[in-house]
From Swiss-Prot:
Role this protein plays: Catalyzes the attachment of threonine to tRNA(Thr) in a two-step reaction: L-threonine is first activated by ATP to form Thr-AMP and then transferred to the acceptor end of tRNA(Thr). Also edits incorrectly charged L-seryl-tRNA(Thr).
EC number of this enzyme: 6.1.1.3
InterPro entries recorded: aa-tRNA-synt_IIb, aa-tRNA-synth_II, aa-tRNA-synth_II/BPL/LPL, Anticodon-bd, Anticodon-bd_dom_sf, Thr-tRNA-ligase_IIa, Thr/Ala-tRNA-synth_IIc_edit, ThrRS_anticodon
Keywords: Aminoacyl-tRNA synthetase, ATP-binding, Cytoplasm, Ligase, Metal-binding, Nucleotide-binding, Protein biosynthesis, RNA-binding, tRNA-binding, Zinc
Gene: thrS
GO BP annotations listed: threonyl-tRNA aminoacylation
Subunit composition and interactions: Homodimer.
Full protein name: Threonine--tRNA ligase
GO molecular function: ATP binding; metal ion binding; threonine-tRNA ligase activity; tRNA binding
Keyword Cytoplasm attached: yes
Organism in which the protein naturally occurs: Helicobacter pylori (strain Shi470)
Primary location: cytoplasm
Cofactor(s) essential for the protein: Zn(2+)
Length: 612
């Protein structure tokens, strides 16, 4: 079955087998006329077809179990697929095994999946009395609607789908949630069931293992266990509290970045957190981003709490006159921003309402774009390398709706391409995916569980310099408009630390660990030596804790291990008398002894090993 053809691919579109036969693109066994075959396997294109059909299998099973069920949409998404529906019956996660069993029953029937094309009038008649399907049709232009059938079940859908339910053997329903109709909180709440499907048993097994591993590594769970951060309902949703250990971790990253930024010619700046609405009107945020902002009124003047740092940095630029000799100007700020996120999308540190960006804005001439972007790419590589992340880049080009001259866009886009080429970086192109004011590069990192995360962005902006009438004096003594490059490598400290926590499972590398060394005196007489050693380590900028509670030695060691501290030193008579330390080293997965002076030199060297 693994070699069976299930669809073809042409012009960036998946075409299922039935449609491909009609179009002369397949004979049912092989792809024809220059199309790419899609076989039944765990490749991305095949999984899209498999998961789409599994969503229909889910809907068919729900209809059999709950005859009054009505269905909205059931798309393929990054985490598998889902279906939104409603029923008068109460459904909980405890019902998922029952629904899954019914899906397996239908799959074993080996039902042919066929397609029918209806006019709008016919489709409205076919789904008469089904307000959810009518809602789907109202969002679709044109007069042709696909209806897919398997057994007695049929559903409005554009496809693509498998030719038969017999292919669906390896799937799992993963969770149940609520979802507003069409994502609009003013509409009724529907039930959403998520699932995953693969062509192979191994694919499903590996995925479920990763899910279990992800649960263990969940940053919200680790945040509590390791004392990194918390949330408080009395303060408000999406507003994290950084606890001492989490703040230490964050400060270490901030300090490493600051040192590197200064060496790379960036200047620290600081803008206010509230700015008059007048400047948000000039920037365009007031018209285009207002629903994501918070506002307040002071002395009858409206102010907006900043959702981004760019306007403040523009005002720093405007605080003085500039010539071409001053450029490029690189401003950075760990800028606290606030964005009005709906409560349903808030998720630990990954999606919050207050966060701090590692933000920088570069003001340069057009000719300097490539060299500046090249320097950012070099900086990005060093940061990702330090944290053991693999990463990929995606270049987004000019969208249909955009501002600026074609030649200017082409020149800016080519500058980004040349910078990527200079660093021999393979990159994807998102045609038309750029902002209306300039091309961009997105930085996507891959964690230890092979999940991809959007973090940093390098954005060329030809809009805000125009809106704010920015200028510098060029070599001909004429006023010229600079280009503005928005640049965040981590994205936000909150999001990056969430990803970092899950990537390492809380086992942070020594150079950023919130507690780097645990000192465990065996009894009271060893406590003085532990305190002296603590002071010596603190002078070397090491985060160290003395575990001196009246517990057994084994219990104190287990506590240090549970806190995922990289180095544990047990201090007894021998260590105090000889000053030869007994070290449990998590990173080396070894226990060894080392003279005190040598140990202090070693940890000092470890702190100097990492730089961006």
């Amino acid at each position: 079955m693994s070699a069976e053809l299930i669809a073809v691919y042409k012009d960036e579109q998946i075409i299922d087998l039935e449609s491909a036969k009609v179009l002369g693109l397949s004979d049912g066994v092989k792809a024809l006329n220059g199309t790419e075959p899609i076989y039944f396997d765990d490749s991305p294109l095949a999984l899209e077809v498999i998961r789409h059909s599994c969503a229909h299998l889910l809907a068919q099973s729900l209809k059999a179990l709950y005859p009054d069920a009505k269905f909205f949409v059931g798309p393929v998404v990054e985490e598998g697929f889902y279906y939104d529906f409603k029923t008068a019956s109460k459904i909980s996660e405890e019902d998922l095994p029952k629904i899954e069993a019914k899906m397996k029953e239908f799959a074993k029937l080996k039902l042919a999946i066929t397609k029918e094309v209806l006019t709008r009038e016919q489709a409205l008649e076919r789904f008469k009395g089904d307000e959810l399907k009518h809602a789907v049709m109202s969002k679709i232009s044109g007069d042709k609607f696909g209806v897919y059938q398997q057994g007695e079940f049929e559903d409005l859908c554009k496809g693509p789908h498998l030719p038969n339910t017999r292919f669906l053997n390896h799937f799992k329903l993963t969770k149940l949630a609520g979802a507003y109709l069409g994502g609009d909180e003013n509409n009724e709440m529907l039930i959403r069931i998520y699932g995953i499907a693969f062509a192979t048993k191994e694919g499903l097994k590996d995925y479920l293992f990763q899910i279990e591993e992800a649960k263990k590594r969940n940053h919200r769970k680790l945040g509590v266990e390791l004392g990194l951060f918390s949330f408080d309902d009395e303060i408000g949703a999406g507003l994290p509290l950084w606890l001492p250990k989490g703040a230490r971790l964050r400060k270490r990253i901030e300090d490493l970045l600051s040192k590197a930024l200064l060496l790379r010619g960036y200047e620290p700046v600081k803008g206010p957190e509230i700015l008059k609405s007048d400047v948000w009107k000039i920037s365009g945020h007031y018209d285009n981003y207002k629903e994501n902002m918070y506002f307040t009124t002071i002395d009858e003047q409206e102010y907006g709490i900043k959702p981004m740092n760019c306007v403040g940095h523009i005002k720093v630029y405007q605080s003085a006159l500039h010539s071409y000799r001053d450029l490029p100007l690189r401003f950075y700020e760990y800028g606290v921003v606030h964005r009005h996120e709906k409560s349903g999308v808030l998720h630990g540190l990954l999606r919050v309402r207050e966060f701090t960006q590692d933000d920088a804005h570069i003001f340069c001439s057009f000719e300097q774009i490539q060299s500046e972007v090249s320097a950012i790419l070099d900086f990005t590589h060093k940061i990702m390398q330090a944290f053991d992340f693999s990463y990929e880049m995606e270049l987004s080009t000019r969208p249909a709706k955009s501002i600026g001259d074609d030649k200017v866009w082409e020149k800016a886009t080519n500058a980004l391409k040349e910078a990527l080429k200079e660093h021999r970086i393979d990159y994807k192109i998102d045609e038309g995916g750029g902002a209306f004011y300039g091309p961009k590069i997105d930085i996507k990192i891959t964690d230890a569980l092979k999940r991809k995360w959007q973090c940093g962005t390098i954005q060329v902006d030809m809009n805000l310099p125009e809106r704010f009438k920015l200028a510098f004096t060029n070599e001909h003594n004429h006023a010229e408009q600079p280009v503005m490059i928005h640049r965040a490598i981590l994205g936000s400290f909150e999001r990056f630390i969430a990803i970092l926590s899950e990537h390492f499972g809380g086992n942070f590398p020594f150079f950023v660990a919130p507690t780097q060394i645990a000192l465990i005196p065996i009894n009271e007489e060893h406590h003085v030596f532990a305190l002296k050693l603590k002071e010596a380590l603190k002078k070397r900028d090491i985060f160290v804790e003395v575990l001196d509670k009246n517990d057994s030695l084994n219990k104190k060691v287990r506590l240090a291990e549970k806190q995922k501290i990289p180095m544990i030193l047990v201090l007894g008579n021998e260590e105090v008398e000889t000053e030869i330390l007994s070290i449990r080293d998590r990173e080396k997965q070894a226990q060894y002894k080392m003279p005190l002076k040598e140990f202090l030199n070693m940890v000092e060297s470890k702190m100097q090993e990492v730089s961006f």
